[in-house]
Amino acid sequence: MERILALDVGDKTVGLAISDELQIIVTTLNTIFRTSKLEDRDKLKEIIDQYGVKTLVVGLPKNMDGSLGPQAKKVKKYMDFMRKNIEGIEIVYVDERLTTVSATRVLIDTNVRRENRKKYVDSIAANYILRTYLDMQRGKNGE
């Protein structure tokens, strides 16, 4: 099996989380602070190469009715650029409704100061996204 990388793409940051090779354990990675698409691509490619990733699981922020809103369209456009500029990766989208809310709640519950939460919230959201994806895959395979 291979490691899978999850992304929580925002306007200013990209939260990251990665699975182990057995796709059981999910670990948060440092958040990428977005600068330009080319620099973001280089940072992302470095992580992909470092961990031997072939699949990116990307949170798609759907509206509560399941439709794609403006932010979801931005995410898809951003990831279309990455798909065209990073060879050999598969991109899978996962509904990420309320993951940032859940991640923020965890940080509040663990007494992380308000000014420090932004450093962690996107990567924790990516962790939720990847765990959701892995749970769905296990359900499909009857595990």
Model feature map: region roles:
Residues 2-4, 12-143:
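Phosphate- and other anionic-substrate recognition elements at nucleic-acid/protein interfaces
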Residues 8:
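Conserved catalytic-loop position in the HRD/HxD motif
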